[in-house]
Amino acid sequence: MSNAPILLTPGPLTTSIRTRQAMLVDWGSWDRDFNQLTASVCEQLLAIIDGASSHHCVPLQGSGTFAVEAAIGTLVPRDGKVLVLINGAYGQRLAKICKVLGRTYSTFETAEDQPTTAADVDRLLAEDSAITHVALIHCETSTGILNPLPEIAQVIKHHGKRLIIDAMSSFGALPIDAREIPFEALIAASGKCLEGVPGMGFVFAEKNALAAAEGNAHSLAMDLHDQHAYMAKTGQWRFTPPTHVVAALHEALQQYNEEGGLPARHQRYADNCKTLLDGMAAIGLRSFLPAEIQAPIIVTFHAPTDARYQFKDFYERVKAKGFILYPGKLTQVETFRVGCIGVVGADGMQAAVNAVAEVLREMEVLDI
């Protein structure tokens, strides 16, 4: 495993040996010990947002997008209307989910380097009383932009509407307190800032809203009301759970708490981000976002303009030096992305910068 590349991606990401070793044990999906493992995971997840008194944690098999679709399909009534706030590819995905589910929705889109503002949301809600829910990406992973969640949440509360937060790339590293930020649902997954492996999403659903959601869901497997009710009654998952993923997440959460929880995880990622930004700037690579709206999760860089630069060749050369990058998902500008998260520290980030510099020299890329 020592020769395995470091994943500088927004998830899946590099995991610890302890987390990987936790998957060497097989679990019976209906066994009491596994039920206790699931309950412990949910309890620890709720503690991160101080949400035990206000929200249920409902785990779901699959990717984070499965959980996002389940949250919208379960919690938005069939006669509801969702305002989708978009400034990147994952906001676009929220809108596509609403369309496929047959939920009425409207969109408000800003440029990929412009956060949605609370004033925007205030105006949009004042103009359309039919809106029941607002769906927001906290950290838009396609660029790394951070949207102003606390301010937007208060505006939504003021209008008496309900907030659904896709916190896939922020949960566990950026503070979100359920006692201070009103939301009906917050969605995240195992393979991001918690440094588990992919395969399980989870939804923090406001207790009263979840209780009232019976019959809303478009799907049996993605019915969060039924999933929670069955778990509350039996301690078990309704359908075969990703046992090894749950075990890995339980171990990753132990390491999360040993490290110092959210403040320590945030600080390490912030240090990684600073090392990355400073190092890339020193070799002439420009970041896509200004620092004040850059989340310490993933950084997007403008691609060099030199004709000798080709991303596929660049990617393979950097990979050969031990680092896996991520292509940009922007439609307007050619970019590439470098993640700051996973089991990596500032020294690893500096090594990645050095690898990028070496590759650009090898490719004779001069015009950056």
UniProtKB/Swiss-Prot annotation:
Enzyme class: transferase
Record field: catalytic activity: (2-aminoethyl)phosphonate + pyruvate = phosphonoacetaldehyde + L-alanine
GO molecular function, one term: 2-aminoethylphosphonate-pyruvate transaminase activity
Entry keyword set: Aminotransferase, Pyridoxal phosphate, Pyruvate, Transferase
Residues the record lists as N6-(pyridoxal phosphate)lysine modifications: 192
Cofactors demanded by this protein: pyridoxal 5'-phosphate
Pfam families to which the protein is assigned, alphabetical: Aminotran_5
Enzyme Commission number(s): 2.6.1.37
Domain of life of the organism encoding this protein: Bacteria
GO process terms (BP): organic phosphonate catabolic process
Oligomer status and interactors: Homodimer.
Alphabetical list of NCBIfam families matching this protein: PhnW-AepZ, PRK13479.1, transamin_PhnW
PANTHER family tied to this protein: 2-AMINOETHYLPHOSPHONATE--PYRUVATE TRANSAMINASE
Record function comment: Involved in phosphonate degradation.
Family to which the UniProt record says this protein belongs: Belongs to the class-V pyridoxal-phosphate-dependent aminotransferase family. PhnW subfamily.
Protein's name according to its UniProt entry: 2-aminoethylphosphonate--pyruvate transaminase
